[in-house]
């Protein structure tokens, strides 16, 4: 039988004896992919350290050995890069895979659902906990609901199927109580028969990791019927997790930048304001940078941009500054021209205009007042154009109106870090009162813990030992 051959190939591709949960997941996949009903989907849930990435990699290699088309996707650039490395096959962001820019609209930000010309392809989406199903206000992409559009795109292709992989204990999308793409009833609501499985057995090699041992303890608090209490983090006997006092942070961060590299070190905070404080302190006291933007600065894009890179640069993408020039003040804002490289896109180089004011504010992007002032100022520059349509088109193509909105990327909120992994991760939870000890906080802490691959540092954190 085809399913028997597929199962054998998956086991061979895995290269080691699977756990009971992994074996069950592979069996479920065989039933899913060989079902005569093509309106089927599969959800594979799994916590950190349970080996779901190994199962996904085995599925990809087995399907490719049978000459079946497999398309890998993830919500963010860094998540796609990690998925690609784990699966040994290229991966795209969901947005880049399913959307195409509208033509002849004069609006550079209009993206419609693309055409899926594939036949009998398997689409696998990692980090699916991040996928929202609520329409976003003023959304530039498709219907505005990423999950709606993803399902529509996949099943518009003849015989195509969707597999969603994620961790239900992680933070759900902003404004959601749980992750819709990992919720069976939500996916069934699209008229799909859903196969589901969960890898819940922590792999033996994970027991020696303080990161995964503590993350597992934190995750299990979500399933415990007892009232929530402060997680009792254990450090003793683990080399990969440690507490850091505030007075030692500068020296420790400097060491991480030297050992792991700036692109593999991150500070995770509870708020944009805390991230801003850390970013300012790191630039001044660790990196010794005085100018607002310098060569070598790591940035994070905070608003989708369609002007400088095809097809677009997404909110959450990271950039490294290679060169800064022509700093200037216009329209009550400050701008600079910069040469950037995008590490999540194989170091692709971009020349762009950046608005500098977002770097030093607590706001997540330009405020409505700043945006309106910028629009009015740029529009006035094109008063010589006789027709309103011409003036609006000129504004939408203007380099200052389309300037990249960025934040420093040394410290970010957990939602911004989600989907990514770093060798060295520093967690600052800030002040935490008894009222703030909620399931949402536990998910935040679990998500932050599981961003680290080598070393985790807890800043001013009360631990068990």
Task: Name the predicted role of every residue range.
Residues 3-6, 25, 29-30, 37, ...:
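Conserved helicase motor core of P-loop NTPases
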Residues 335-465:
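C-terminal accessory regions
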Residues 2-16, 45:
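Conserved adenine-nucleotide phosphate-binding loops and their immediately adjacent elements
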Residues 26-27, 31, 36-234:
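ASCE P-loop NTPase helicase motor core
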Residues 10-28:
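N-terminal pre-Walker A segment at the start of P-loop NTPase domains
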Residues 88, 282-285, 442-446:
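Short, solvent-exposed amphipathic alpha-helical segments in soluble enzyme
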Residues 22, 76, 271, 419:
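Short, conserved phosphate/pyrophosphate- and ester-handling motifs at nucleotide-, phospho-/glycolipid
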Residues 18, 72, 267:
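Conserved SAM-binding loop
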């Amino acid at each position: 039988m085809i399913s028997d051959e597929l199962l054998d190939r998956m086991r061979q591709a895995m290269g080691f004896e699977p756990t009971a949960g992994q074996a069950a997941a592979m069996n479920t996949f065989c039933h899913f992919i060989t079902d005569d009903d093509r309106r089927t989907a599969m959800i594979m849930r799994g916590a950190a350290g349970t080996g779901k990435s190994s199962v996904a990699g085995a599925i990809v290699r087995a399907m490719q050995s049978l000459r079946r088309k497999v398309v890998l996707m993830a919500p963010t650039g860094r998540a796609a890069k990690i998925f690609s490395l784990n699966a040994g096959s290229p991966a795209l962001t969901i947005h880049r895979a399913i959307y195409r820019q509208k033509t002849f609209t004069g609006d550079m930000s209009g993206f419609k659902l693309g055409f899926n010309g594939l036949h009998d392809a398997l689409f696998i989406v990692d980090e699916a906990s991040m996928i929202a199903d609520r329409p976003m206000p003023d959304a530039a992409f498709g219907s505005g609901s990423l999950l709606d559009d993803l399902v529509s795109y996949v099943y518009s292709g003849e015989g195509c199927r969707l597999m969603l992989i994620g961790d239900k204990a992680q933070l759900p999308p902003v404004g959601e109580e749980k992750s819709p793409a990992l919720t069976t009833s939500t996916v069934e609501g699209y008229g799909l028969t859903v196969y589901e499985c969960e890898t819940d057995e922590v792999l033996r090699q994970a027991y020696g990791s303080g990161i995964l041992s503590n993350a597992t303890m934190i995750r299990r608090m979500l399933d415990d019927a007892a009232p929530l209490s402060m997680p009792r983090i254990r450090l003793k006997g683990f080399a990969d997790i440690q507490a850091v006092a505030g007075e030692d942070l500068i020296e420790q961060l400097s060491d991480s930048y030297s050992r792991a590299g700036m692109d593999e070190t991150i500070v995770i905070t509870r708020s944009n304001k805390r991230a801003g404080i850390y970013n300012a302190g790191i630039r001044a006291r660790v990196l010794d940078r005085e100018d607002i933007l310098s060569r070598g600065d790591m940035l994070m894009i905070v608003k989708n941009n369609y002007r400088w890179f095809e097809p677009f640069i997404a909110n959450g993408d990271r950039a490294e500054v290679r060169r800064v020039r022509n700093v200037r003040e216009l329209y009550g804002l400050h701008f600079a021209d910069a040469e950037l490289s995008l590490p999540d896109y194989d170091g692709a180089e971009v020349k762009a205009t950046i608005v500098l004011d977002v770097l030093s504010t607590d706001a997540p992007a330009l405020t409505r007042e700043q945006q309106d002032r910028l629009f009015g100022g740029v529009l006035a520059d094109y008063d010589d154009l006789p027709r309103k349509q011409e003036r609006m088109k000129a504004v939408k193509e203007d380099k200052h109106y389309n300037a990249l909105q960025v934040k420093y990327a040394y410290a970010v909120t957990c939602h911004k870090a989600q989907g990514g992994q770093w060798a060295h991760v520093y967690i600052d939870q800030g002040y935490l009162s008894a009222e703030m000890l909620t399931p949402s906080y536990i998910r935040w802490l679990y998500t932050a813990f599981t961003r680290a691959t080598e070393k985790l540092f807890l800043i001013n954190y009360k631990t068990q030992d």
